[in-house]
């Protein structure tokens, strides 16, 4: 492994004590897991309680009534989803973000990241609520690999060189450049990070198949296609472009041919207006 990459992983900030305790309890309890103990662990951390209630009442989950207690959150989302979203939110809060090595405006990039989570929640909320809830943590961290590789490039002093090569190639070969400079591309790195933080294996495998969802096992193929569609639509350089909007529909059709049930009418209805407009235009 690239020494700088290894250093980046080793230097990742530790997870908060409460998050680690919850993760260890859920992962070790199996069928003996008790909801009351999950609630007791979370209740030790007032900041975590506040953040969970904020997330539960956000548009990500779309509950029809105000959620006011941790017991309600755990009951509504389930223990596994709670563990994963707590992990994702804790990780997301730990990093300074500067994606200038990619030639991207950081504020625009962060807005796009937020839109990804909003979309996957809105798209799947009525069609497959369980899937929507399961994938929110993945969507929250979808661009984390890019964020950390950007930090690594800045730290190593190679950010300007990387950016110049990226510009020379018109930002068309980002993954190849990432492999050249960092020894890994940002999507593969995200899978490595999910494994490092011990996310559920279903989420690790879903992330691992974002770019080849057809190769995913049947058990997580719908997860992989949903993430692949979101990744395509909100591709950081050209989010919602004519090409990416049409490619997302091609992915839905591919999923259908693979025996995965997505409602095309619902997908088209939930597309952002920019994507709907761009479906009528020629590709970039």
Q: Residue spans of the language-model regions?
A:
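Cytosolic terminal low-complexity segments enriched in Ser/Thr and acidic residues
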Residues: 245-248, 254
């Amino acid at each position: 492994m690239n020494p700088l990459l290894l250093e980046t992983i080793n230097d990742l900030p530790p997870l908060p004590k409460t998050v680690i305790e919850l993760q260890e309890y859920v992962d070790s309890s199996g069928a003996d897991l008790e909801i009351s103990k999950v609630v007791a662990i979370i209740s030790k951390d007032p900041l975590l309680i506040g953040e969970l209630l904020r997330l539960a009442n956000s548009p990500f989950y779309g509950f029809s009534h105000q959620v006011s207690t941790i017991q309600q959150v755990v009951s509504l989302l389930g223990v596994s989803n709670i563990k994963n979203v707590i992990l994702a939110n804790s990780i997301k809060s730990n990093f300074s973000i500067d994606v200038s090595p990619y030639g991207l405006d950081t504020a625009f990039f962060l807005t796009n990241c937020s839109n990804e989570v909003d979309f996957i929640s809105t798209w799947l909320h009525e069609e497959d609520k369980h899937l929507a809830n399961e994938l929110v943590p993945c969507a929250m961290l979808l661009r984390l690999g890019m964020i950390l590789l950007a930090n690594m490039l800045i730290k190593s002093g190679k950010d300007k060189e990387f950016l110049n090569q990226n510009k020379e190639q018109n930002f068309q070969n980002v993954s190849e450049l990432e492999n050249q400079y960092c020894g890994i591309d940002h999507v593969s790195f995200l899978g490595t990070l999910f494994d490092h933080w011990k996310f559920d294996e279903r989420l690790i495998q879903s992330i691992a198949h974002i770019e080849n969802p057809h190769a995913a096992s049947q058990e997580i193929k719908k997860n992989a296609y949903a993430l692949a569609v979101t990744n395509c639509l909100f591709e950081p350089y050209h989010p919602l472009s004519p090409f990416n909007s049409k490619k997302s529909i091609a992915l839905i059709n591919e999923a259908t041919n693979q025996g995965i049930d997505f409602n095309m009418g619902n997908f088209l209805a939930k597309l952002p207006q920019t994507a709907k407009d761009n479906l009528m235009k020629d590709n970039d």
